[in-house]
């Protein structure tokens, strides 16, 4: 399934009962969050609020509120199919030349997909059907949500921020929250290591005193949105990956006021600039951790133009204690990560990021252990191989007889196969999420690895326990008479 734009995707969701239109007036201030949160926790549909109080523009929430909708957005039927997306990314990250004609034939589908990587630049586009500029720019006319009672101000959450460094041909797409502070002013909360912030730093060094162009796309097609949150290789642009997912080249258009290229079918595009030195205190905001984060200073984004489609839809979300939409995305993208990790570490059987671990702060790995110390090698690999896991605080490694997605299994392995002193690895002074207030220093903290594998010679001097296993023949005999026993049948 391929979608030309967000509206194509909404049509399909509605046909499948995965979209609910809300006609009752609902306030973007707190009320939409309350409804969206209850709906997501119940595994409910995406929500289109057609009459937000005080606004004429509808609000779309919970678009990716179930793993299946994430899979649908990536052009797959179910979550398990996302492993194929991961295999494609693993191939693109470290391509292997064909070993012969048969191997070449087997790889043809992957090579064919690569043809969809270049973007297609349009002269005119739906996202520029209406152009607002100058004094007419007023962000207060967009139904930007206030999600939690102590939030500082309305907050844009699903904006795809487009930037380009002074020496780069390729653009960067990143999702950074943006606090509304004026009719044409937003605070761009990007951390210093993120792509947009790096582009800005390079711009300030190369062109001191010049304004840094920025554009933000809201309501792009699902492949482009998900391309911005997927672990694409550094050599691959998010637009290129979206083309791979969609099966057609990503259509882009040059912005009205700068040379950046934005998704042609986006519902709304904000164009403007950031000036070096113009900063403002951002926050506090309720975040995906379930807490309000501290106030900090970030650059101010001045919006000079708003372009949009006729009857534009504002795409938004909320973040809070899991489950929320980022947690659901984490569950789905988990399947993408597995083949990428397995390409580098074939001994990995499964990899799981429990949603209650705030999407990435805790990982469980199961592996086919082959030698003493092997589990520690895998721990270090998880922390270092993909930048998405540089903030993972806890890595639990188990043998392949443990189900990584079953806490009963994992806790059993931890409590029976671990000695706390011997099998715990502590690493100090490592990068930690800025939002992690538990770390002693902002952005810098420790990590813990738990080796819950069976211990090999060299790791222990004791005779190691053998897991109890049932007799298969007895199990088969009891299976045959189980219904006849009627143990659970009502009298």
From Swiss-Prot:
This protein's membrane topology, according to the annotation, is:
Peripheral membrane protein
GO molecular function terms here?
A: 3-octaprenyl-4-hydroxybenzoate carboxy-lyase activity; metal ion binding
What does the record give as cofactor? prenylated FMN; Mn(2+)
Q: How is the cofactor bound?
A: Binds 1 prenylated FMN per subunit.
Q: Which GO terms describe its biological process?
A: ubiquinone biosynthetic process
A single Gene Ontology CC annotation of this entry is: plasma membrane
UniProt keyword annotations, A-Z = Cell membrane, Decarboxylase, Flavoprotein, FMN, Lyase, Manganese, Membrane, Metal-binding, Ubiquinone biosynthesis
Q: Which reaction does it catalyse?
A: a 4-hydroxy-3-(all-trans-polyprenyl)benzoate + H(+) = a 2-(all-trans-polyprenyl)phenol + CO2
The pathway is:
Cofactor biosynthesis; ubiquinone biosynthesis
According to the UniProt entry, what is the EC number of this protein?
Answer: 4.1.1.98
Grouped into one coarse class, the protein's main location is membrane
* Keyword Membrane assigned: yes
Give the subcellular location. Answer: Cell membrane
Ligand binding (Mn(2+)): 172, 238
Residues forming the catalytic site: 287
Q: Where does prenylated FMN bind?
A: 175-177, 189-191, 194-195
The UniProt function text for this chain reads: Catalyzes the decarboxylation of 3-octaprenyl-4-hydroxy benzoate to 2-octaprenylphenol, an intermediate step in ubiquinone biosynthesis.
Q: How does it assemble?
A: Homohexamer.
**Family statement:** Belongs to the UbiD family.
Protein name listed in UniProt: 3-octaprenyl-4-hydroxybenzoate carboxy-lyase
Q: What is the lineage of its organism?
A: Bacteria, Pseudomonadati, Pseudomonadota, Gammaproteobacteria, Enterobacterales
